[in-house]
Amino acid sequence: MPSTLLWGAAGGIGKALTQQLTASGHAVVAVSRHPAEMKALTPHVIAADVSQPPQVSAAARMAAGMGAPFDLFLYAAGDIASLKTAETPPADWNRILTANLTGAFLTAQASLPHLKADARLVFIGAVHERLRLPGLAAYAAAKAGLEAFAEVLRKETRLPVLVIRPGAVDTPFWKKVPFSMPKHALSPQALAEKILTALEEDKTGLLDIP
């Protein structure tokens, strides 16, 4: 049975991925700030905040005892805010960068010792070129940085790395931005299905999912 270490599991996309992965036969260790929301989806749940290095390290060690070595590392944590640069408190800037970029670094670093030699790493990114809009400086910068980090990580580890760049997805993110959700927005479940298909097809690099 393949095993997956999923960070940011309680978000809309994270939950959908947990459901799809378990349905496809994966043993999923789900790490989340809200573990109670995940217990109905997988028996292997760990509480941790990806912005806190000690919690990330402890969670990775706990996860190792539940399913290591892992076949798949998946980072689905993220956050967004709509704040113009001149009005952005440094704490909010740091929060968005941490959720989308620094957390990816922290969790990948802590997880690498517990991955199989041929493991895959997947990060949930964004089509950031289309998000360079007033109020989204932190989010767009973080997602652009995530792609650069993922590329370097691939070169360092020589493992297959995939950055998923979804279009609009129907999640609570839309409540945090002053835009209307497009009518063509994917459901988290539909996105998760497409991600699993990409994994089955051994996709790597950047993958746009409109």
Where are these regions (language model features)?
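Rossmann-fold cofactor-recognition segment
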Residues: 42-54
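N-terminal Rossmann NAD(P)H-binding glycine-rich loop of SDR-like oxidoreductase domains
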Residues: 10, 14-18
